[in-house]
């Protein structure tokens, strides 16, 4: 036609001109509207109807809903269950086709008349359509289509391992993909394997900056992890991140917490060096040493109960703080001060071995 090959914005004006010249244009006016743009190129997105492949979800969703409601699968923290059930109870059919250059190609085949069959291989399609002149659909699968099969597709080459590893115990992931990935894996597990893919799902929060903005390249508010590790050490960064990660809530990243984590790692290292410099004297512990050792062992026992409770409830930041206080306050600030020998004196061999044992436990 007359507009073929034109830039879309130029074509719009050309169409309006032709309509006007034909006396068919009633009115033109400016409208304020929300215009979608590509995240990568910022180009204006043009909505248009197209043929796509859909997966009917109504038959797949019920076992996945029942599995969570019956606690066959438990979501942590508890409020994520409400989000999950809302998505599942209002589910729409899944558009699984994508117009991309890469991915798993749609296994649909066409003959010259447009007849279509879905087959695993070209040979099966040729037989089904009764002609060698077949072409495969050029679309590829949505990336989540392969991902929802992940809990058991990884065992395709080693099926004997599936009985041991499937279902697995715990999945740790982000709340932003609760429907895109987690819900679909649950549906696939019940549909294709007849059982859940995992027992527990722990949802982490979103990492945000101190202004509560999502970390992104576009905003430039995301620090380079390698730079943080170079400055504070890997353990320092881990501790700093966990300090601000209450169960399931968003994580407000503050670099000062990585610094605090680094101080904690140094505290552990300095305590190790201190114990390594002790010289031994008598074999048996003194009464004061025995009192300190027994007290520290009792504190470890109490902390283990707290840790068991925190981990069972997936409260990882609380577990970290229990460990932090046990090491920094109880072990370093109290126990070592009670046991370490005065200048020029020695610690008993039994107390030193007990201290090393406590160190290993910590």
What are these regions (language model features)?
Residues 147, 151-155, 210, 243-244, ...:
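A short secondary-structure junction motif
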Residues 42, 204-205, 268, 331:
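Residue-level signal for inorganic ion chemistry
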Residues 1, 99-249:
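Alpha-helical recognition segments enriched in aromatics with Gly/Pro capping
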Residues 94, 98, 180, 185-189, ...:
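Short alpha-helical functional segments enriched in proximate histidine and acidic residues
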Residues 110, 134, 209, 242, ...:
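Acidic, turn-prone loop/beta-hairpin segments
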Residues 1-112, 213, 219-264, 269, ...:
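Residue patterns forming the tRNA-binding/recognition surfaces of aminoacyl-tRNA synthetases
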Residues 193-195, 269-284:
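Proline-centered turn/helix-capping motifs that create local helix->coil transitions or kinks
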